[in-house]
UniProtKB/Swiss-Prot annotation:
Domain of life: Bacteria
Signal peptide per UniProt: none
Gene Ontology CC, one term: cytosolic large ribosomal subunit
Gene3D superfamilies from the UniProt entry: 3.30.420.100
Ribonucleoprotein among keywords: yes
Function comment: This is one of the proteins that bind and probably mediate the attachment of the 5S RNA into the large ribosomal subunit, where it forms part of the central protuberance.
UniProt GO molecular function: 5S rRNA binding; structural constituent of ribosome
Organism: Chloroflexus aurantiacus (strain ATCC 29366 / DSM 635 / J-10-fl)
CDD domains assigned: Ribosomal_L18_L5e (cd00432)
Biological-process GO terms, alphabetical: translation
Protein name listed in UniProt: Large ribosomal subunit protein uL18
InterPro entries assigned to the protein according to its UniProt record, in alphabetical order: Ribosomal_uL18_bac-type (IPR004389), Ribosomal_uL18_bac/euk (IPR005484)
Record's keyword terms, sorted: Ribonucleoprotein, Ribosomal protein, RNA-binding, rRNA-binding
Similarity annotation: Belongs to the universal ribosomal protein uL18 family.
Length: 120
């Protein structure tokens, strides 16, 4: 068996985390996916497997400017997902970092969502 790729290692971590992190209708899961260029956030009800709200830097009409860093854009996505969740009546979530370290863009998104009113 060869050396595992960073993607395989992240997926193993994510599966390990998902054994404990589960979204309910009262407290859905805030999931984060980070690609090299974009960052995506979804609020998911795992009991039925539905995405309740979503936000990303890959959306049509994204208002990010070329002067912003990826970390600053992640903070804007965090604020946007929190605003959309609050409009949908969601105040409490369970944070799922997706196997990524709680650092950099993932941390910026989470802190911006907390500041905008989401509790986790």
């Amino acid at each position: 068996m060869g050396k595992r790729t960073p993607r395989e290692l992240r997926l193993r971590r994510h599966n390990r985390i998902r054994k404990r992190v589960f979204g309910t209708p009262e407290r859905p899961r805030l999931n984060v996916f980070r690609s090299h260029v974009h960052i995506y956030a979804q609020v998911i009800d795992d009991t039925v497997g539905h995405t309740l709200v979503a936000a990303s830097t890959n959306e049509k009409g994204w208002s990010g400017s070329p002067e912003l860093t990826k970390t600053q854009e992640a903070a804007l996505v965090g604020k946007l997902i929190a605003e959309r969740a609050l409009q949908a009546g969601i105040t409490k979530v369970v944070f799922d970092r997706g196997g990524y370290k709680y650092h950099g863009r993932v941390k910026a998104l989470a802190e911006a969502a907390r500041e905008a009113g989401l509790n986790f």
